[in-house]
Amino acid sequence: MLKFIQNNREGTALLAILTLFALLGIIDRNYFSLQTFTMIFSSAQILILLAIGATLVMLTRNIDVSVGSITGLCAVTVGMALNAGFGLAASCLFALLVGMVAGFFNGILVTWLRIPAIVATLGTLGLYRGLMLLLTGGKWIEGLPADLKSLSTPILFSISPIGWLAMLLILAMAWLLGNTAFGRSFYATGDNLQGARQLGVRTDSIRIFAFSMNGVMAALAGIVFASQIGFIPNQTGNGLEMKAIAACVLGGISLLGGTGTIIGAILGAFLLTQIDSVLVLLRLPAWWNDFITGLVLLGVLVFDGRLRCAVERNIRQQKYARFTARAIISDKKTTVSDNTPAASNKKKAAL
């Protein structure tokens, strides 16, 4: 059972989502509906995009805690560009470029300068947050054009253009990681860095690409944030890094690298957003969200560690049992061969 849970974290996350839907459907029959599902998906889009980027980084056995600051910086970038008179496409492309450069810089710090990822991204967290506040003077950005808000307006099956883009990105990344040699390089890099290098994997390029794509996903999340609420507060992106990591771990992405899937991370993001909707349903204050997220992350990490130890212990016991069984069989064969007439004659001749 433990091995099944360890190997099917996506199924476990999906079961948790369906169970929560069923329980809340019993409490409020209106909750169990397509409208509720699309509403949660719309609310989860920012976290889904961040989870996609965080998955790539965590698969390589790294972590990026600066994504919240990159999200805020890129939201400010697109807002300032739009208010300066640039078109929507140019403003969004500029924000994506800023996100990619920020992620690339993180990758350079980790791969070329050999700074531990947690230390490097803690530094850039403050750097990007400070740059965001310098650009805005600590003020909010308001008066964003309607074109930006249209990106989050439902168009087909109550899903916005950004929502459809997010689903395409999920499918593309799932295919990339599961069906290409380039995608499997992420797993190899995170599982055994030196072994991957000996196999010819360009591990530095893989890690830099992972951080760069993480920056792009954070930039896209910043664009979604600005389009959904129509203005940009000076604290945009605060705390999102913890939620992104929690979503990935909840969906089966290992902090030790080399394990997990995009689908699992997306299910984890959806489950966390669903928990937030429960808090709204129960009319609990908004500041409970961070507490619940931290509690879920801590609980999943403890459970994951205990589960991994239990599975490894079970595997060791099975190996020991097989070894013992082979030893017993070997002893029996030796005893039988010693009791044969030919063996008896050899013993007499020796005497």
Swiss-Prot record:
A single GO CC term, please?
Answer: plasma membrane
Where in or outside the cell it occurs: the entry states: Cell inner membrane
Q: Where are the transmembrane segments?
A: 14-34, 39-59, 70-90, 93-113, 115-135, 155-175, 213-233, 252-272, 284-304
Annotated keywords: Cell inner membrane, Cell membrane, Membrane, Transmembrane, Transmembrane helix, Transport
UniProt KW Transmembrane helix keyword: yes
In the record, what terms sit under GO molecular function?
transmembrane transporter activity
Q: How does it sit in the membrane?
A: Multi-pass membrane protein
Major location category of this protein: membrane
Purpose: Part of the ABC transporter complex LsrABCD involved in autoinducer 2 (AI-2) import. Probably responsible for the translocation of the substrate across the membrane.
The UniProt entry's sequence similarity note says: Belongs to the binding-protein-dependent transport system permease family. AraH/RbsC subfamily.
Q: How does it assemble?
A: The complex is composed of two ATP-binding proteins (LsrA), two transmembrane proteins (LsrC and LsrD) and a solute-binding protein (LsrB).
Q: What name does this protein carry?
A: Autoinducer 2 import system permease protein LsrC
List the lineage, top down: Bacteria, Pseudomonadati, Pseudomonadota, Gammaproteobacteria, Enterobacterales
Question: What gene is this protein a product of?
Answer: lsrC
